[in-house]
Amino acid sequence: MAGCGATNFGGTFAISTTAANDDLTLSEFLGLTYIEVPNLVTADSTGVTQNIVTDSTWDRPVVCKGKGEANGGDPNVEFQDTPSAGMDLFMAAAAYDNTNNYACVFTWADGSEEYNRGLVTGPQRTKGGNEDFKHVIFTLGLQQPPEVVEAASV
């Protein structure tokens, strides 16, 4: 019987301690120093999306389509609002006047890793009801396709 695959339980998120303003190879991602931003609550999907452009002509019954601009993604990442060195670094990266890009890595409990690089904006501070925890939400403006390392390769 096949397994169910990895869940997000036990995973972590970390940001590079230095700016990374140029596209990175996997070996360059691996060569950076990261600090964990603890208490990740949820993260949006990552990966490249690409516009599909169309051109309608009188003589074609079906429009012509082509690939347009690609976007590295703009996922939100939400954390419990608790003090830590990682949160301090993330807040500094998100400052409105900090235009640097940073590398980040999602790591799953099975050892799989996904590396991304981009801008950090925010935070937005959630409110909610009586029994909700304080959370902060940041948006990552990713600048290149992710580099994925499967668990067997780590």
List each language-model region with its residue ranges.
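Solvent-exposed edge beta-strands and adjacent loop segments
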Residues: 1-78, 121-132
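Charged, amphipathic alpha-helical segments and their flanking helix caps
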Residues: 5-10, 20-21, 87-97, 107, ...
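Residues that flank catalytic or metal-binding motifs in active/ligand-binding sites
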Residues: 9, 73, 100, 116, ...
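Viral virion structural and adsorption modules
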Residues: 1-6, 141, 145-154
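Short, positively charged, low-complexity/disordered linker segments
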Residues: 21, 26, 30-37, 92-111
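Short beta-strand and beta-hairpin "edge-sheet" elements
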Residues: 105-149
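Structured, beta-strand-rich domain cores
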Residues: 62-109
